[in-house]
Amino acid sequence: MKNKNGIYIIGVDHGYGNIKTANCCFTTGVESSDTEPTFKNDLLIYQGRYYQIGVGHKEYVAEKVMDEDYYILTLAAIARELSREQIAQANVFLAAGLPLSWVAKQRKAFQEYLLQNSAVEFTFRRIEYRIRIVGAAVYPQGFAAIAPIVNHFTGSNMLCDIGNGTMNILRTSDSKVDLRQMFTEKYGVQQCVLAIQEALMREHHAELEEQMIHNFLRYGTVGIDEGLEKAMKLAACDYTKKVFRKLREHGYDPRIMKLYVVGGGGCLLKNFFPIDPGRIVINNDICATAKGYEYMAEVQNLAGGVK
């Protein structure tokens, strides 16, 4: 979060697996109810309804404006950032993004979605917030993570942003983005999770909670039966090989270009693929894209002129 002339720029990375801001990350899940729930740890109250944030897992949707979920999750993200500074009333400028291949077509609708209410009052974690959303910008997902450093890129480079639902790919040449070489593949981490679940059921008649699988992908082990972990590792290794196959389909050549990997899926390559650290750079900061959105909004001075 950045304070620009009394306006707080808050970057929100609306992932399919997690919502990220510059300083926090929580599961992309929300359950709504007309009645107050028993457990209230991450409870958001808005317009008379109760929303449990981080509960369940939102299904993949091609357009994030199809329901109210991402709007409610945005309010929670705003509150999480403001609470760090003990702020409950603020003018907020939202900096968000969409997958590379979709941003041109969906930018306007998503911007209007985020701006649907200029004044918003809600309660989160028992704190009442009064927010004025003074503007919003929507940027290319993935590129935002390298925006602060792209001017230092030389030669030919490829960016691979592996999220939960999608994988975004773009090429740069001498720090300039090649607009003809931007791609979005529906081949995010969730595809690896599904492959692992299938392998465990097929080979061991075993079911494992998704969170345990995500922990395995992140840390390389979860301390369960050796045979189960072996099957999980084989499925994860197969997924990473397919990631590089898709990169090659879009022109990746390790002899010519460096590869920059961002997003939560970077840990899969780190744990399950033989990485050449001289040619492949993995950014482990899951909040890098949200930070990039804030950087881009600040550089473009979008919030500075808003009254």
Where are the regions that the model predicts?
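Ser/Thr-glycine-rich phosphate-binding loops at phosphate-binding pockets of nucleotides
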Residues: I162-N168
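Conserved blade-register residue in beta-propeller folds
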Residues: T21, I169-R171
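Acidic, metal/cofactor-coordinating or nucleic-acid-engaging core segments within structured domains
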Residues: Q197-E203
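Nucleotide/phosphate-binding catalytic cleft detector across ATP-hydrolyzing
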Residues: M1-L159, K176-Q191, E203, E210-K307
